[in-house]
Regions:
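Core catalytic alpha/beta fold that binds nucleotide/phospho-ligands
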Residues: 2-226
């Protein structure tokens, strides 16, 4: 299976009463995955998430009810169309929402900041071969590579519907500067997994993952106030 990523990046979208977003949502196919970037406001909690999902579902945002899955992954509550799968992540004032049909995406974003404990954390939680590869990097590159691995692992685990408690050492990933890729996953076929780094700018690192065939990933920025 090819691990090449088909990615189209679009200019900032205006969401005038959701009309533009509705046009985008209507085009979501089984071979696509939509990723939205928006400003995270703690006071609004899941309101923007529900509003965006409502556009895809064709219902008002306040009609979108979410429930937590077995391991805390948010899901659409019945009787909503649960064939629409989503995941979201936020860090600082940035948030990402992944939306798909026919697969369960996992997404994770982290803001870049000094992480003096990056290597100790890696040595405690990561796979032995990842640790060795990180140690082989220049010290100036280790923190960025650590964050790339961390967000990638989070994305895969979230796509599985699991959390960190599953064990970060139970999956092994390609270590930067190699492209993102699942090399081994305990209890599953690693070649069935897609893992891609998202173009979120120099202030963050983000990855999206799903199990299944390659999809076209479309990346959008939701206008503030949308």
């Amino acid at each position: 299976m090819s691990h090449a990523m088909a990615l189209r990046q679009h200019a900032r979208m205006q969401t005038n009463q959701g009309q533009d977003v509705a046009n985008i949502a209507a085009r979501l196919g089984q071979d696509q995955l939509h990723v939205w970037r928006l400003r995270y406001d703690r006071a609004r909690r899941r309101e923007p998430l529900c509003a965006l999902l409502g556009v895809y579902l064709g219902v008002p945002g306040d009609a979108v009810s979410l429930v937590d899955g077995e391991h805390g992954r948010p899901e659409l509550a019945e009787p909503l169309d649960r064939s629409l799968q989503f995941n979201w992540s936020h860090s600082g004032d940035a948030a990402l929402i992944a939306v798909a049909r026919g697969c369960a995406p996992g997404i994770d974003i982290e803001q870049l900041r000094p992480r003096p404990r990056a290597m100790p954390l890696a040595e405690r939680f990561f796979h032995a071969e990842e640790i060795a590869a990180l140690k082989a990097l220049d010290s100036s590159d280790q923190e960025q590579a650590f964050l790339q691995l961390w967000t990638s692992k989070e994305a895969v685990l979230k796509a599985m519907g699991r959390g960190i408690a599953f064990g970060l050492d139970r999956l092994r990933l390609a270590v930067p500067p190699a492209p993102s890729r699942v090399l081994w996953l305990d209890g599953d076929d690693a070649s069935m997994w897609q893992l891609h780094t998202l173009p979120v700018g120099k202030d963050c690192v983000a990855n999206v993952a799903w199990r299944g065939a390659t999809r076209m990933v479309e990346y959008w920025t939701l206008a503030e106030g949308g």
